[in-house]
Amino acid sequence: MTAADQQVGIVLPVLNEQQALPDMFDVLRGLNPAPAEVLFVDGGSTDASCDLIREAGFRVLETATGRAVQINAGVAAVQAELVCILHADTAPPGDMVQVIRDTMADRRIALASFTPLIKGPDKTRWVTTFHNWIKTWYAPLITRPHLFIRGVRLLFGDHAMFFRRRQFLEIGGCTPSDAVMEEADLCVKFARLGKIRMVRRWVQTSDRRIAAWGPLKANWIYFKVGILWAVGARSRMAKDYPDIR
C-alpha cells in the first residue's frame, strides 16, 4: 500500500448537532496520527451547527437533507483513498487512523467498522451494546440468508464504517432515497467486492436515543426498522425511526 493509499479522510454527516459538536471537535483534534481530511456534511441544520464547525476551523459542505445524500456528497468531495463515516455522537479511539490503515491493508476486506459501545453520562448500555453487536450477524441471517452465506454482514452508522473511496464510487455509494438504514444496502453492495469485518476496537456512541425512548422501545424500534428494510417497506422506515434532536 502506497503513502497515497494510506491517506484517511473522515466524513461526518450532521443535522442539528450543536450540542454534540464541541466534544467531537476535541476528539478529532486528539487523533494521532491525524487524518488527511475532515469534512462535515450538513443536511440543512436550523441550529448553529454550521457556524460552530466553521468557527472551529473545520470544513463544512452543505447539502440536501438525508444521510445517504450527505454521505454520497461527502465521499465524492474528499480526496483521501480511505474514508470513514463518523457520526457526531460517536467517539473513536485516538489511534483510529492507524487502525483503519492496518485493517484496509488487507485487500480482501472491502468494508469494515469499529465495534460500538453504547454509553451515556451515567451508564453503559450493555444489553443494547450486545444487541447492536449480534444483529450484525442475525439481521442478514434472518432477512437475507442467501447473502449471509455469501458473507454479508450488516454494519450500521454508529459502527464508524470505513472503506476505499474508489470502491464506494464504483458501487454507486448509498441509495440516495434512504433516510435510514442507508448502511444496509451499502453492506450488500460492498460484499460483492470482498469481506466485511467489524474490528475489535470500541467506538463510544451516545445512548441519547435509548435515554429518550427507553431501552425496550429503542431495541424494538431498531428491530422493526430492520424488518421493514428486509421486506422492502422503505417508505415506512423513517416514520418508524423518529428523530430525537
Question: What do the predicted segments below correspond to?
Answer:
Residues 42-50, 90:
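A conserved acidic beta->alpha catalytic loop
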Residues 95-127:
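Conserved donor NDP-sugar-binding/catalytic core segment of glycosyltransferases
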Residues 62-78:
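Glycine-rich, basic loop-to-helix element that forms the pyrophosphate-binding segment
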Residues 1-27:
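N-proximal low-complexity "stem/linker" segments adjacent to membrane-targeting elements
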Residues 26-35:
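Short, acidic, metal-binding catalytic loop of nucleotide-sugar glycosyltransferases
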Residues 114-121, 130-154:
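Short, flexible, basic/aromatic active-site loop/helix in glycosyltransferases
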Residues 179-186:
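Acidic donor-binding loop at a coil-to-helix junction in glycosyltransferase catalytic cores
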Residues 83:
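Short aromatic/hydrophobic "clamp" motif used to bind/position activated sugar donors
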